[in-house]
Amino acid sequence: MPPRNPNAEPKPFVWVPIPSEGPQRREPTTHERFVGLTGVLEFTLTVNSAYLFVGSGAYEFDPNARGDRPDVWYTFYRRNGQLCIPGTSLKGAIRSIVEAITNSCVSQYKRGEEIPLSHQRCSYRPGKQENLCPACRLFGVAGLRGRVHFADAIPVGRIETEIIKIGELWEPSRQEEQNRKFYQAKRYAELSDKRPQTGYRFVEAVKREASFQCRMYFENVAEAELGLLFFALGCEKDEEKVVIGFTPKIGGAKPRCLGAVVFGKPKVVLRGGSTLKDFLHARSLTGDGAIRFLQQCMQKCQESGLIHKSSWEKFRSEMRDRDEFCPRGMY
């Protein structure tokens, strides 16, 4: 095997170690009755990287393309003709963060990847095997509906797309064992040669500052669990403020440093109480009221021990935005 290129551009990978101790598996909260907090978190999602690409699985082509015009490109996801970010994409991205920072099971892995026995995917069998890791208790597992759901995110105002050229995306040749993989928020490296060529592809993306309206529905969650979700959305407590700690990445082409987003402008709608009348009467928190509620839940989360300290510190330090370019070529 030829030696690796010592001058190769650093890859934007983050490896978060899987702890040696197994997850804290407990009985999940179920759906027979309402307990804890039930409601919806409304917020904006703003593109923080140069571009965001959420693929539809389809492509378009221009039979008249010449010169540096793209001939074939992968399209952005749409619902009824409108640009959209599927709720499943948001849920998957946030769940992967929750799994990493709470020392939960590894729910998604490919055949041949070696996962420690202690962190194998949770299994739920009523009356036989009911204890689940923190992430599976929140997001669900086969046989048990989750308590957190994301709606499709729709554009705020008019959003223009752009066809951009990126290096081809290949499967990694080697997986790091005993680690979870994420992607850093580095700077997108624009290619000067726009012509179609082997080893590159074109994608339809939305640009920085594009905003989408999001909704996260939660049911029967504890304050600490809701605080955990706020941490996973990139929030961080700073004395009396809630600040951006890191930018989660969603969508495709993450190895090309696309997909970093910021969640903001929270509005919380809570339902609950001891009577049906109390439950049907929603309580809305906006502005400073919503921020104080976020702080309260995040404080409860820190006190609860839900977050695995060393995993969180490693993840947070590696996921902060970096003023470095992504590799331009194939890797």
Short names for language-model regions:
Residues 1-331:
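RNA-binding basic/glycine-rich loop and surface signature characteristic of RAMP-family CRISPR effectors
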